[in-house]
Amino acid sequence: MTYGHQLTFGVLLDPDAARPGDGVLLDPDAARAGDSVERARLAEELGYDVVAIAEDPDGLDAWTLLSWVAARTGRVQLAAHTSVPPRDPAMLARSAAALDLLSAGRVDLTLTTGERAEAKGEAEAIEIIRGVLDADDPRPLTYRGEHYRIPRMQRGPLPAHRIPIQISGYAHSLLQIAGRTADGWVAELAVLGPDGVAAANKVIDEAARAAGRDPAEIRRTLIIDPGVSTDDLLPLIVEEGAGTLLVRSTDPTVLRRFVKDAIPALREAVGKTAGTVPGRSAAVRAKRRAGIDYDRVPASLAETAVEPGDVEYARVRNTYLRGGAPGLVLRPRTTAEVVDALGFVRAHPGVPFGLRSAGHGISGRSTNDGGIVVSVAALNGIEVLDEAKRLVRIGPGARWGDVAAALAPYGWALSSGDYGGVGVGGLATAGGVGWLAREHGLTIDHLRAVEMVLADGTVVRASADEHADLFWAVRGAGANFGVVTSFDFEVDEVGDVGFAQFVVGAEDPAALLVAWGQAIEAAPRDVSGQLILGPRRPGQPSFAQVMAVVDADQPDTIIDRLQPLAAVGPLYDQNVVLLPYAGIMANAAEGYHRAQGDPVARSGLIEHLTPEFAAAAARMLASGAVHWFQIRTVGGAVSDVPADATAYAHRSANFSVVAMGSDPRRVDAVWRDLYGYFDGMYLSFETDRSPDRLTDAFPPATLARLRELKRRYDPHHLLRDNFTIDPRGGQR
Amino acid sequence: MTDYGHDLQFGAFITPTAQPAHQAVELAVVADRAGLDLATFQDHPYQPRFHDTWTLLSYAAARTERIHLSGNVLNLPLRPPAPLARSLASLDVLSGGRVELGIGAGGFWDPIVAMGGRRLSPGESVAALEEGIEVIRQVWAVDRPGPVQVRGEYYQVVGAKRGPAPAHDINIWVGAYKPRMLALVGRAADGVLPSLGYLPGGAEDLAGINRHIDEAAGAAGRDPRAVRRLLNIGGRFAPTGRAFLDGPAEQWAEDLAGLALEYGVSAFILAADDAPTIERFAAEVAPATRQLVAEERTY
């Protein structure tokens, strides 16, 4: 029988075998060190899957050597054959996580017992290692075992992949551990013989079943001497289920011969019985959510899909602003895979569905509880299509900081929000209010064509000439109509820009707002920016943060433009720098999203910051219900585009206003007083999902047209995560 | 004026952040290419935001060519000395003699204990470090007869095989501030490695540090020049001078030359997590400081 594992081959760089008989040895350690590294590189070059390094009491430290080898190889799996003790399980886990991150997920651990025959603490060590690596669990790790005690340590870091932990040995106690909890079992063929392997497998399988596990969860690895014939190896694979063979040799000739003769013959002989991707363990499957047909995930997506029990889950469950617990995250890498993903979503009509580019969305949830998330993060290409026309093609999963960095060498920029961590897909289907908005318009105003997958799986190209109706809709309400898989933009020539950050006194926030609004409206279009206010804190001075970008590279011009902005209130601090646009966008936090909770954001678009509006805003700030109040500049080139040219229709506004809080009732109670001053809103900054908000986001004519298009392109209402337009809804 | 006459070294003190995974390695590569002498990483094994420092050092050593690497400083309470000695020797062999041992007695006991380590009083931790250094030196001393024999209060390593032999004499630099630890440095270490930011009296405290070390060295029959004085520093480059190590590179050089000539500091390790700062430290500050000190020393 086999256990269904993909057959892999490795090299065990065994210190005993490494004791070279050839060559002149001046410094045995140094020679052997170089030898091991060279053999590891050779093994990778020859196509071996695994390089295993065993502890050598007389030689180099195995972990140090493995770390070195990791840095000098790029593909091969790195197997540490090591013992606890002397290694401490918690420290070993930290080390394994580090090397796994550095080597992009190539580490696996095999616990050996050295001279000791019986198990002693290995089961506890496995629990501790797994506990440390489970960084998704926010609780500290506490462990009270017979061999180890950990009072209360922080878990993590999260490794790059699920690090397999295998057990090596022959004693019943070790086989039991292998069956009960380990991811694999490693044994030497020469010690056990084929009959011994069969007997050990039986013990492991029984222990696995007794623990409620499928014996196939445990990969069987045999260490073989190079002399063993293919005929002897074949039954070990097809009958005893060996999934990995580790050749114990450091002789290049032997390593080459095994690759040339044995591996192809073995692969061919077992081709029909082995070679599938191993399924998820019972422990992982136990965390699956109801209503999702996990076994029907399309083959093209299975390898990259993430479900709650996976290590990768911690990296994909939350977004920048929200905690989430989706039941499945599909991560297509191509348009065809997006088609497959939407097919899977269509087969789950009652299950929540979120679409994510980089997970920065406020209106678009892009995570959920128990539903499906399709993340297009892997569709992150940035490609110049036509240098003369400044035409670039960008994938929805790219982040704007990366886009800015990629365009900078050409002297180009695409105004696109103010934070480098925002993804292209969400912003470029909604609007895009950026640092150059007044001069160069919205991000969508630079869009020339998209490729998108519609709800029914059709792939279309939309532009002014093809599917012009969709092209209109995708610029402002794109999330309702499909998954854009690439955007063609015409970008601008932008040199260095002036970037100013002022701290101004806000004792009288209403006066400040009016003064700032007037200064902005009076400024030439090469000035865009924003103003941020927090709640008033009793007894403390009040400040506002004023930021501005001046698209000019002459310091005199920049200073000239900034003077009126610096004069809107008492200036407490200032910082003005001349830098490339990409330098402003290089502000994204690193690492995966760890947000918790659910924010409340309200958006409004407004033409002028009148004294009446400013007074209402000041009252709102004084209430304490809002902890973040931000006004961005639009107008200018944004207003040059006719209101009916795109689904983003509120073109007359000069300002985009956002308030954020945490309690929707408290926020709405104070937001109500501002609401009357607005002429619509920018949907990207709004969290309210009530259908009324649709009429704020889209004027009647726009909404009517969108609803008609929604009926045509998404009649079954598949796309409903971000300002959804119900195709069955009435004409508002 | 105290000057022990050491050649000047310049290094980077790089945060071993686990995210992005390669940031620390890439900065070590930058430091290597820029011509710095040392790339160092702090070691807080209880802090999961950081890479395991030993794994990072090993990986970074394999990605660099010339620069020496060290923990700054390795945490002895969570890194038992015999395996640590073997790891150091192994990396020294692999890297062609580019590893040094910055080590500390442990300072943050709560998280050390929370991870399963043993809480020691300040005095105990000094004694433990002295034993640890003894174990490490015995493991490295492959030419001495018999196995490792340390029957200490904190570490008992009896009968362990010596080796592997390091490729060069690995320096042992101790993070030390207080008299007992400084006395240990004077007796048994190759260098002292404090952080300027932790000196309550600023650079002037270095005089007291030197005095304790020199007295202990003398009492142990060692030449004070056997102990290198290293220093972790922080600063920022600015167009005009505002304060100590806050100004243009030329001012930095004068500030550092002052420390070298006044207090005998001969290794400056700059806390920096960005490539331009590391490159500027190497290209502008290091040569100018060396020149100033050389000019002064010729008088």
Located regions from the model:
Chain A
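Soluble FAD-dependent oxygen oxidases
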Residues: 262-732
